[in-house]
């Protein structure tokens, strides 16, 4: 009989159960799993055994995209069933469905089609504004009225632990011409990233009242920034090379 023990201080109790994409040495195929304590639950095996009540098929995918697109009713149904399976119905689980976390290799959880970074913290916007424009002009007038953001580079989103190469670009020394060099002011920003699951038709806005039904889950996000490159290039259209070289996210998506 399987007995899953979870340390009281674990970040991954039964109340969490985040989703991710993983592989193992014995089975290099990418598939979907859920984190429970020091274990990864192989959802593809559970699905193959019809333990969710019906077979979904998307847990054998190399990304969460089809699962995310299924919508909130399916998300809720699977989560409720998974909680029962790893809780009161542990006896129905196969041993092969539980893999020690140190034996898995994590992968990017989602095929990311687009990525928008919002400038949502007043304190952060003020501090960066002071860095570039001085204290008197730190906060731009539009910040108080609209969600300031920029489109990042989806192809350079990587999971935590991936090496980040220091970017090179133009910087403008004081009282000297711009020069092409490696960034000397590489910065990091701890943020939260939201994955949108169910989409919308082109040109049709999502209302505030229904936005919750479209948000699949959250990850920790590090918006790497080359501040010296950014200071020279950001006017008039905002950051470009200063922020498109890497964005790190956690491999587990908390829902």
Language-model segments: what does each one mean?
Residues 29-41:
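Short, surface-exposed terminal/edge motifs of secreted or surface/virion proteins that either
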Residues 1-24, 35, 44-255:
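Active-site microenvironments in enzyme catalytic cores
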């Amino acid at each position: 009989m399987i007995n899953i023990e979870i340390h009281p201080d674990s970040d991954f109790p039964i109340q969490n159960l985040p989703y991710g994409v993983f592989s193992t040495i014995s089975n290099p195929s990418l598939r979907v799993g859920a984190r429970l304590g020091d274990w990864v639950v192989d959802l593809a095996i559970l699905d193959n055994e019809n333990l969710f009540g019906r077979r979904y098929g998307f847990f054998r995918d190399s990304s969460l995209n089809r699962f995310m697109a299924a919508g909130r009713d399916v998300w809720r149904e699977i989560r409720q069933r998974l909680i029962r399976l790893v809780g009161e119905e542990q006896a129905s689980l196969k041993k092969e469905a539980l893999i020690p976390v140190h034996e898995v290799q994590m992968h990017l959880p989602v095929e990311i089609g687009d990525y928008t970074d919002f400038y949502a913290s007043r304190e952060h916007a003020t501090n960066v504004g002071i860095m570039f424009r001085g204290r008197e002009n730190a906060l731009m007038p539009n910040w108080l009225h609209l969600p300031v953001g920029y489109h990042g580079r989806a192809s350079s989103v990587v999971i935590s632990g991936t090496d980040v190469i220091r970017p090179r670009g133009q910087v403008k020394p004081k009282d000297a011409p711009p020069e092409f060099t490696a960034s000397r002011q590489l910065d990091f920003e701890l943020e939260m990233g939201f994955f949108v699951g169910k989409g919308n038709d082109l040109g049709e806005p999502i209302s505030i009242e229904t936005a919750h039904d479209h948000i699949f889950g959250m990850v920790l996000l590090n918006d790497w920034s080359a501040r010296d490159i950014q200071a020279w290039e950001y006017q008039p259209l905002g950051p470009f090379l200063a922020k498109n070289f890497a964005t790190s996210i956690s491999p587990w998506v908390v829902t």
